[in-house]
Amino acid sequence: MDLNDTPEQAGYREQVRRWLDGHKAQAPPASGASDDTAYIDARRAWQRRLAEGSLAGITWPKEFGGQGLGPIEQVIANQEIADARVPGILDVIGIGMLGPCLIAHGTDEQKTRHLGPMLHGDEVWCQLFSEPAAGSDLAAVQTRARRDGDGWSLTGQKVWTTNAQFAAYGLLLARTDADVPKHKGLTMFIVPMDAEGVTIRGLRQISGEAEFNEVFFDDVRLSDDMVVGGVGNGWGTALTVLMYERLTIGLGSSGMGYRSDRFAAAVGADPAASRDPDVRRRLGDLATELLAIRFTSYRTLTALQNGQIPGPEAGLAKVTTVNAAVAAGELIADVIGPDALAEDSEWAYLISFLPGLKSAGGT
């Protein structure tokens, strides 16, 4: 496995870098409050700029507005965006996970209606899978969709739903047949988040934000054209989302957007910490872990690039990335102290939010 860019990849990296150099002055801050409407609007506008600059939907087929490139180009773009200290796309869930599901399983009408607005940030999407009694055991979902005339009536609850508070649509897994084995009685639906009967309640985190939500459905009416992948085929459709979810979480972050030299600089700024043997050991462990994550991610990318199905390393990427994030946050908090959680600190997001990704995408 060659870890260097090919000439074509090096050219693509330079193209991305030039675009970012020319546009990053218009970028909003890399992080902000999820309940700040002005910030979310700025992120939508930035995603539109990224799409216009061919930096959104990089792996989507060209016929749906994407670039038709491979996962390696996606990682190159992620790396350059992180190095430029600008935010990436706002709707990672939509473009990284739900859009590919619609491309694979959606009707022509669904693709035409939703993929363009999703790509340009006009429609943000959320994933309506987890329930209070159905997390990693996803097939145990109890949210019910029953036939009601020529449509469906949806009743139930979802939890830990990221971005539901400003999403236009959600992709929801519901039980449509309780008389068959649990994996067979499921159907996937598109749900307008402003539909009558939908209630969204934020879940406050240690960071003070409420990026996760509970979502309640009380006799929500859905038309038959909101079914994705066919009635009773929800489990297979959900597996497509889950595959892209693990890849998005594990590979899309490219080391959480942090490189070991940034942690070394933070430690080096404190003379006492930089001489502390335990701090130096922890920094060395973290640098090794980040390098291992990157190399393991490259193994997955190489398999995908060669048309192969990645092995367990694809799922492990998510787990190891989050574990490294927790270790990194603890190291920075110990070295910098309370100032690391200040509102304008570049480390606040790492320390207070990323540990929550332990639950994201299943455990």
List where the protein language model places each region.
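Loop-to-helix element that buttresses phosphate recognition and phosphoryl-transfer chemistry
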Residues: R281-N306, V322-N323, A327-D334
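Alpha-helix capping/hinge segments and adjacent helical runs
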Residues: G22, Q67, L242, G315-T363
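Amphipathic, small/basic residue-rich leader segments at the start of a protein or domain
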Residues: M1-L90, R113-H120, I249-G250, A265, ...
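A short, Trp-centered hydrophobic/proline-enriched beta-strand micro-motif
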Residues: G121-F129, L173
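A structural signal for short hydrophobic beta-strand segments in well-ordered beta-sheet cores
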Residues: T143-R146
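A short core secondary-structure module
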Residues: T155-R201
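Internal helix-loop-helix
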Residues: Q47, A51-D122, T162-Y169, L290, ...
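Glycine-rich beta->alpha junctions and the first turn(s) of the following alpha-helix
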Residues: P7, V198-R294, L357
